């Protein structure tokens, strides 16, 4: 379906719908009914949880993870966007505004791009390996850049009376059953109904930006 209007997209890394939202943003930039619609899609992606953009500020934390200064004037950006497209004040939200502003967790800073994924991003394929025993962190699951050969399948026993515990992550709207955000996953990784695939130790920092 064609996209018909300029838009300012607010997203959160720990929202349950971050993947589909960014896919829709990408769709809007390519399927606008005209150049105005296609060329005026803007996205801001912060490290907050669902609908918590207003919490972005100095000394920001998501779950257990300290992320430094994540300040973003959320309301101010909305007003400026409205001034440009609803009140014909182009100087309020100039055309030089970056198309995408996203918070890079790890180096803990806001970055900009004119597209998503960023132009410098390289699509990389990773493969799951094991000897058939990828269960828990004590298993033999590996994550590799090499395609697997003739390896046995991994399996686990599912017990609905004892489901896998969920700790953090992207979530919303569950009445507080799960608190979204970044949390230590070691309690989950020791259970045998979870498959774990771990890469070799990285020799240098790696930035992940794009669709996963």
Regions found by a protein language model. Give the residues of each.
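Active-site-proximal cap/loop segments of hydrolase catalytic domains
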Residues: 1-94
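C-terminal, loop-rich substrate-recognition/catalytic regions characterized by aromatic stacking residues
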Residues: 53, 59-212
């Amino acid at each position: 379906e064609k996209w018909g209007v300029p838009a300012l997209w607010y997203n959160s890394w720990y929202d349950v719908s971050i993947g589909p939202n960014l896919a829709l943003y990408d769709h809007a930039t390519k399927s606008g009914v005209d150049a105005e619609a296609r060329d005026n899609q803007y996205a801001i992606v912060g490290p907050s949880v669902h609908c918590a953009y207003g919490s972005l500020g100095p000394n920001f934390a998501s779950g257990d993870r300290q992320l430094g200064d994540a300040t973003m004037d959320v309301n101010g950006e909305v007003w400026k966007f409205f001034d440009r497209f609803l009140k014909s004040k182009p100087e309020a939200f100039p055309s030089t505004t970056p198309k995408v502003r996203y918070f890079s967790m790890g180096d803990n800073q806001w970055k900009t791009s004119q597209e998503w994924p960023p132009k410098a991003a390289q699509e990389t394929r990773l493969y799951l390996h094991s000897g058939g025993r990828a269960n828990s962190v004590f298993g033999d699951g590996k994550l590799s850049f090499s395609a697997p050969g003739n390896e046995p399948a991994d399996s686990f026993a599912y017990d609905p009376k004892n489901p896998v515990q969920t700790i953090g992550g992207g979530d919303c709207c569950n009445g507080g059953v799960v608190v979204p955000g970044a949390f230590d996953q070691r309690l989950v990784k020791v259970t045998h109904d979870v498959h774990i695939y771990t890469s070799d130790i990285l020799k240098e920092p790696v930035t992940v930006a794009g669709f996963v």
